[in-house]
Regions:
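Structural motif
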Residues: 1-2, 77
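Alpha-helical metal-binding/catalytic segments enriched in His/Glu/Asp
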Residues: 3-57
Length: 182
């Protein structure tokens, strides 16, 4: 399982990529602590920091090309997160991950509200929907994954090698004016 994020930015990168990179580094630190306590992941985990994402996905693409034979044999998933901010969970990816994503999102508590991150996002979707939309989605908290485009480091994994991918993050509660700056 490959977990990645880029570390290059157009400007100072306060939101993209630093927020995503901080999350990746904390995940790696916590997994490391768990391993020291005896936890053994069922799969090999790789934490990757890519360069050259902003101009053309250069780092991840070159790495995928250089390691394609091993990746074809061993890689089962790529998980990406460019940005995290205050707000609501969002995800795009290989649709085989929908149930997995929904199960996890239903279990993770939002620290601000105490409800699950899935329920918090559902409440926002419901509040923002028009009348027809409300009647269509009311009571259905299942979150559909959006389709992945070609705009981040998941691209070479899914588009070049066919490795399933997931792009996750949080956002939607701020102006986002600092996206590519500080």
């Amino acid at each position: 399982v490959i977990r990645g994020n880029h570390h290059d930015a157009w400007e100072f990168g306060a939101a993209d990529p630093i927020r995503g990179m901080v999350a990746l580094m904390e995940e790696a630190r916590v997994i490391s602590e768990l391993v020291k306590q005896g936890y053994k992941p069922k799969r090999t985990l790789m934490f990757c920091a890519w360069d050259g994402e902003e101009p053309a996905l250069l780092g991840s693409t070159e790495w995928v090309e250089d390691h394609q034979e091993e990746l074809k044999k061993k890689a089962v998933a790529y998980i990406n997160s460019d940005g995290n901010a205050r707000g609501f969970i969002y995800a795009a990816g290989s649709h085989g991950y929908e149930t997995f994503f929904n199960e996890i999102a239903a279990e993770v508590k939002d620290p601000q509200t105490g409800v699950s991150i899935r329920d918090r996002s559902y409440a926002k979707v419901l509040a923002d929907a028009d009348r027809a939309g409300k009647s269509r989605i009311y009571g259905n908290k299942y979150m559909k994954l959006s389709a992945l485009g070609a705009g981040s480091d998941y691209s070479p994994f899914i588009q070049y090698l066919g490795i399933s991918a997931l792009n996750i993050g949080f956002g939607g509660e701020g102006s986002g004016g600092e996206y590519h700056s500080i």
